[in-house]
A protein has these predicted regions:
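Amphipathic alpha-helical repeat scaffolds
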Residues: 32, 97-105, 206-212
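Acidic/glycine-rich phosphate/pyrophosphate-binding loops and surrounding catalytic core
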Residues: 68-69, 73, 77-85
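Structured adenosyl-cofactor binding patch, chiefly the S-adenosyl-L-methionine
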Residues: 75, 108-114, 122-139, 186-231, ...
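Short, hydrophobic beta-strand segments that form beta-sheet elements in well-ordered domains
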Residues: 28-30, 46-52, 75-77, 143-145, ...
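Glycine- and other small-residue-rich loops at beta-strand/loop junctions that grip anionic moieties
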Residues: 2, 28, 94-95, 119-120, ...
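N-terminal positively charged helical leader segments and presequences
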Residues: 1-69, 73, 228-236
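Active-site/ligand-binding-proximal alpha/beta "capping" segment
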Residues: 155-204, 208
């Protein structure tokens, strides 16, 4: 039973709340039974698993938690054990710095069977806020670098693109979204094959990046599941 604040396992958890240590050690920390269960169900084994009242004094575990309500379980995992690879649809994110939005987009990618590619400048998907927003999807969704995503690149822009439902696509698709404040820079847009916009009827200037990405993924999934929509989307 861990009963000292100076215990090395507790010190490790504290360190891993800092991105610099996560990057240096190649580890991440999850808080709460739901996230730990998501890791287990995905076949990702913990390096350390601390359980309040079983192998650590509850008050000490609470002290190293970032949550307002202390979790019963805190786990440490290897980043290298997270899924990698490609899927037919990839959500490529350019400098999406808000961890809540990033985690939500990873969760949406999980729901619609997509992968996620991240540029430099994105929030850390293994940070505490992003992990909570992803609801454990981080253990199921393959991640890649922004330039590693393969397929026809479609930039999702607020205005001026082809209406998303009218876009003609076939094969692998990379849906490219920009940062919350600045969107996509010209050099990224220049590397895209198409520009698409989500039709809006209301006066809102634009959609939140997590909402826009989710709608884009839904539209692509809808086409993939509908034979008639799939036929109409193929290029002649």
């Amino acid at each position: 039973m861990i009963a000292s604040r100076d215990n090395e396992r507790l010190k490790l958890v504290r360190k891993l709340h800092d991105r610099r240590w996560r990057d240096k050690l190649g580890l991440l920390v999850v808080e709460g039974e739901d996230l730990a269960e998501s890791a287990r169900d995905a076949g990702v084994e913990p390096v350390e698993l601390l359980v309040a009242g079983e192998n650590v004094v509850p008050e000490l575990l609470a002290e190293v938690s970032t949550l307002a309500h202390p979790p019963r379980v805190v786990g440490v995992y290897r980043r290298a054990d997270l899924p990698r690879g490609a899927r037919p649809v990839t959500l490529a994110l350019w400098r999406v710095a808000d961890p809540g939005n990033l985690g939500t987009l990873i969760r949406s990618a999980d729901a619609f069977g997509a992968g996620v590619a991240l540029s430099a400048g994105c929030a850390d998907p293994t940070g505490p806020k992003a992990l909570r927003a992803s609801m454990g999807a981080i253990f199921r969704v393959p991640l890649a670098g922004f330039d590693e995503a393969q397929g026809r690149r479609v930039a999702l822009v607020p205005h001026g693109g082809t209406p998303l439902p009218e876009l003609r696509l076939a094969g692998e698709v990379v849906l490219v979204l920009g940062s919350e404040r600045d969107g996509l820079p010209e050099e990224v847009l220049a590397g895209c094959d198409e520009r698409a916009s989500i039709p809006q009827r209301g006066p809102a200037e634009s959609l939140n990046v997590a909402m826009a990405g989710t709608i884009g993924l839904y539209e692509l999934a809808r086409r993939a599941s509908s034979p008639s929509a799939r036929r109409s989307s193929l290029r002649s």
